[in-house]
Swiss-Prot record:
Heterohexamer; composed of 3 copies of TIM9 and 3 copies of TIM10, named soluble 70 kDa complex. Associates directly with the TIM22 complex, whose core is composed of TIM22 and TIM54. Interacts with the transmembrane regions of multi-pass transmembrane proteins in transit. Keywords: Chaperone, Disulfide bond, Membrane, Metal-binding, Mitochondrion, Mitochondrion inner membrane, Protein transport, Translocation, Transport, Zinc. One of its GO terms (cellular component) is mitochondrial inner membrane. Pfam families: zf-Tim10_DDP. This is Mitochondrial import inner membrane translocase subunit TIM10. The gene is TIM10. A motif (Twin CX3C motif) lies at residues 42-72. It comes from the Eukaryota. Belongs to the small Tim family. Signal peptide: none annotated. It is found in: Mitochondrion inner membrane. GO terms for biological process: protein insertion into mitochondrial inner membrane. GO terms for molecular function: metal ion binding. Mitochondrial intermembrane chaperone that participates in the import and insertion of multi-pass transmembrane proteins into the mitochondrial inner membrane. Also required for the transfer of beta-barrel precursors from the TOM complex to the sorting and assembly machinery (SAM complex) of the outer membrane. Acts as a chaperone-like protein that protects the hydrophobic precursors from aggregation and guide them through the mitochondrial intermembrane space.
Length: 102
């Protein structure tokens, strides 16, 4: 990845596979999407949003908010893992039977 940050001044344009760059960009987009969904979901659930608390009174999270964020994050990743495993199993089963995409 040093070519992205100018670490290697050799002529890298010819040696960089555009398909790999496209896959890396797509992966970064997916990771960013997961992160944004996690932040939005857990913030909405855990950070008090009553009219009196729309402005953050404290610079840090309250203890209850912090615990909620920790639990929400753990649950989010656990569900994400289980969904990924289930989708992988479904894809493998469909591929084995030849019914993928039908």
């Amino acid at each position: 990845m040093s070519f992205l940050f100018g670490g290697n001044n050799r002529s890298v344009e010819g040696s960089v596979d555009p398909a790999k760059i496209e896959m890396a960009v797509a992966e970064l987009d997916m990771i960013t999407d997961v992160f944004n969904r996690l932040v939005n979901s857990c913030h909405t659930k855990c950070i008090s949003s009553t009219p009196l608390n729309h402005r953050y009174a404290e610079g840090d999270l309250l203890k209850g908010e912090s615990v909620c964020i920790d639990r929400c994050t753990a649950k989010f990743f656990e569900v994400n893992k289980k969904v990924g495993e289930r989708m992988s199993a479904m894809g493998s089963a469909a591929q084995a039977t030849g019914s993928f995409g039908r």
